[in-house]
Amino acid sequence: MKHRLKIASVIMGFCAIGSTAAMAANHKTPPWGPGPFKVLLEVNQNNRAEWAITINNLRTMERVVGMNTAHAEVLAWGPGIKFLLKNSPYASDIQSLSMYGIKFSACHQTMKAMHLKKAQLASGVTIVPGAIAEIIKRHNEGWTEIKE
């Protein structure tokens, strides 16, 4: 997990540095390219630190890259699905980030295994048939996967 945290921090650091350079260059194409960008963030652990990093990465992406050139989806499955519930400490973050077009997806297979109902999910969460199928689908569509 520490390795993933370091990678995520380095990526966000480069984005922040690139953003400053891009603004200084008076609206030239940013160093990461013109987009569009498609990012799938996969979370399958019931770990508050990982979810906090995921939320922070999404806010950074929205601020630095801009959601007009980026599409982001957070896919939660296994124990990680607990953070998509209404009573999650991140329910308000999910709702506010959804307003920027960020998609939050819950694995239906995990929901069945954990006896969860759609009504238990936070506002803004959609259900996908299965996490593995969603990962494969997004990969085939050219999305970049970041495993939090």
Predicted segments with their positions:
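Bacterial N-terminal signal peptides that target proteins for export
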Residues: 1-10
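Bacterial N-terminal signal peptides
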Residues: 10-19
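Sec/Tat signal peptide C-region and signal peptidase I cleavage site
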Residues: 20-24
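N-terminal secretory signal peptides
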Residues: 25-73, 83
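A cross-domain feature marking catalytic cores of carbohydrate-active enzymes
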Residues: 43, 76, 108
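Short, glycine/serine-rich, charged loops/turns that create anion-binding
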Residues: 45, 79-81, 111
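Mature extracytoplasmic domains of secretory-pathway proteins
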Residues: 63-99, 104-105
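A cross-taxonomic marker for long C-terminal extensions/tails that follow the last structured domain
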Residues: 87-148
